[in-house]
């Protein structure tokens, strides 16, 4: 089963590389980024443009509403269906994105944690708001010591998630992780690379891109999200730039302050992406962006434009 996996930090040039490969090899570009699934965030997540999407088939982009707490498990299910369709069409699947957990699920499998009922999630979130993360971390230490030992006492999101699972299922996260979903792609036939640009140049590009976003629709996206009154803990509401821009629109930050926060958050995220892939998926080949087309062409026996 042939497939190409293109990972890398945000703003590293993944989309252009994937599109060039899709056009040259008859491929379908499959989103492997947890934020680009949201239809409400085309600008702020730097999704491919409509013009780019016309050049080659693109799947799993913008198919989820911001009100949905979309999970890695949901993505795996969606990706499995898309992968079957792409192979039936005789096209090359090209998975592209920066979400390490999605790539890990592709090649190594994923824990099969069942959905948490809304009433359980809402109850845990209410206690989190009322009592604070430290109190819930103490509760987690009693109910799932292994998870509590792994999490910092102020890690609101992960503490809440671990408590939701043990409360809904009666079993700790580790039990579910031990019995998971098999990988979608076997190791053989998979070409996997991580675009690794120079850090300083990448950070400059991130800063410039966020300024362009702010002038090209990002504020309108943030305003539309803010008007919906969604839970601020939803993934879409935590996308880089969204909280700061909403605060700016509410008069709490200047435009310059909001942009600076968005830039800093995005640079920090890029740094975490380097670290995560280095330790979690060492089988990915690290390639400089300027060398990526030649490297891919040699691997696949073709010339990329």
From Swiss-Prot:
The record marks 99, 121 as: Interaction with substrate tRNA. Keywords: ATP-binding, Magnesium, Nucleotide-binding, Transferase, tRNA processing. Belongs to the IPP transferase family. It catalyses: adenosine(37) in tRNA + dimethylallyl diphosphate = N(6)-dimethylallyladenosine(37) in tRNA + diphosphate. Coiled coil: none annotated. Its EC number is 2.5.1.75. Substrate binds at residues 10-15. One of its GO terms (biological process) is tRNA modification. It holds the Pfam family IPPT. Residues 33-36 are annotated as: Interaction with substrate tRNA. PANTHER family: TRNA DIMETHYLALLYLTRANSFERASE (PTHR11088:SF60). Monomer. Catalyzes the transfer of a dimethylallyl group onto the adenine at position 37 in tRNAs that read codons beginning with uridine, leading to the formation of N6-(dimethylallyl)adenosine (i(6)A). This is tRNA dimethylallyltransferase. HAMAP family: IPP_trans. The keyword NAD does not apply. It comes from the Bacteria. ATP binds at residues 8-15. NCBIfam families: miaA. The keyword Nuclease does not apply. It comes from Afipia carboxidovorans (strain ATCC 49405 / DSM 1227 / KCTC 32145 / OM5). Its cofactor is Mg(2+). One of its GO terms (molecular function) is ATP binding.
């Amino acid at each position: 089963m042939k497939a190409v996996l293109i990972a890398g930090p945000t703003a590293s040039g993944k989309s252009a590389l994937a599109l060039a490969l899709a056009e040259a090899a008859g491929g379908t570009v499959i989103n492997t980024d947890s934020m680009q699934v949201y239809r409400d965030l085309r600008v702020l997540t730097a999704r491919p443009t409509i013009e780019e999407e016309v050049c080659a088939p693109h799947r799993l982009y913008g198919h989820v509403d911001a009100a949905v707490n979309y999970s890695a498990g949901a993505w795996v299910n969606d990706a499995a269906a898309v992968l079957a369709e792409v192979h039936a069409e005789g096209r090359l699947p090209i998975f592209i994105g920066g979400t390490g957990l999605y790539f890990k699920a592709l090649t190594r499998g994923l824990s099969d944690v069942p959905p948490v009922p809304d009433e359980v999630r809402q109850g845990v979130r209410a206690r989190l708001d009322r009592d604070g993360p430290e109190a819930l971390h103490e509760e987690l230490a009693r109910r799932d010591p292994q998870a509590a030992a792994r999490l910092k006492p102020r890690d609101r999101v992960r503490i809440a998630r671990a408590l939701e699972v043990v409360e809904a299922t009666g079993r700790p996260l580790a039990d579910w992780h031990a019995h998971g979903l098999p990988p979608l792609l076997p190791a053989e036939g998979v070409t996997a690379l991580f675009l690794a640009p120079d850090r300083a140049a990448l950070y400059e590009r991130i800063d410039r891109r966020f300024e362009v976003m702010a002038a090209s629709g990002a504020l309108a996206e943030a305003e539309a999200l803010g008007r919906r009154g969604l839970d601020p803990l939803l993934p879409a509401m935590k996308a880089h730039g969204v909280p700061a821009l909403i605060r700016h629109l509410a008069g709490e930050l200047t435009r310059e302050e909001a942009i600076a926060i968005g830039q800093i958050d995005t640079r920090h995220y890029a740094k975490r992406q380097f670290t995560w892939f280095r330790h979690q998926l060492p089988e990915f080949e690290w390639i400089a962006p300027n060398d990526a087309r030649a490297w891919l062409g040699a691997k696949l026996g073709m010339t990329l434009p």
